[in-house]
């Protein structure tokens, strides 16, 4: 249930901060939000299967991996189709970029996305661990997005995520109350 509060908070911040851009036809922030919803839907499906079968086994590891990989590849293809993605890997703070072929970049980016999602998912079972690790990462993305020109709205979304996590962490440290 806590995830619903994160979703609501970020969606409200997208609507408030991104309204002007959406009126001008800029939907890139909604793409990111819907991508996150798809991954949340995979997690919900996994939990639903556990409840439905009244056992601790939801989706199999291969089912989860294939769904996550399909979602990551679909997202990357959408971002490329919309012209919001280049095969360049930017190294923050060093003003350096690594140029890759599209195929190498897509494999690398899909690996990073699926790996990150699973890393957070693994830590989510331990009281407060996922949130306490995600807060500094979210703060880093907030600062990075604001530092780079043109990405301020993504910084606001990252800050909204951090705020939601901090509010939830109060109840999620050991012993977790939710």
PLM features per residue range, with description:
Residues 1-178:
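"…together with the soluble PPM/PP2C metallo-phosphatase catalytic core" -> "…together
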């Amino acid at each position: 249930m806590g995830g619903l509060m994160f979703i609501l908070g970020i969606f409200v911040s997208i609507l408030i901060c991104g309204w002007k851009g959406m009126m001008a036809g800029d939907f890139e922030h909604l793409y990111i939000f819907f991508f996150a919803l798809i991954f949340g839907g995979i997690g919900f499906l996994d939990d639903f299967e556990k409840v439905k079968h009244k056992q601790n086994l939801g989706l199999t590891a291969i089912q989860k991996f294939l769904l996550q990989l399909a979602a990551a590849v679909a997202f990357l293809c959408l971002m490329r189709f919309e012209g919001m993605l280049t095969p360049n890997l930017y190294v923050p703070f060093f003003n350096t970029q690594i140029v890759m072929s599209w195929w190498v970049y897509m494999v690398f980016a899909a690996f990073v996305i699926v790996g990150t999602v699973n890393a957070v998912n693994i830590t989510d079972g331990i009281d407060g661990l996922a949130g306490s690790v995600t807060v500094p990462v979210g703060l880093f993305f907030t600062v990075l997005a604001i530092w780079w020109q043109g990405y301020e709205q993504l910084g606001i979304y990252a800050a909204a995520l951090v705020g939601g996590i901090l509010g939830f962490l109060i109840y999620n440290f050991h012993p977790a109350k939710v």
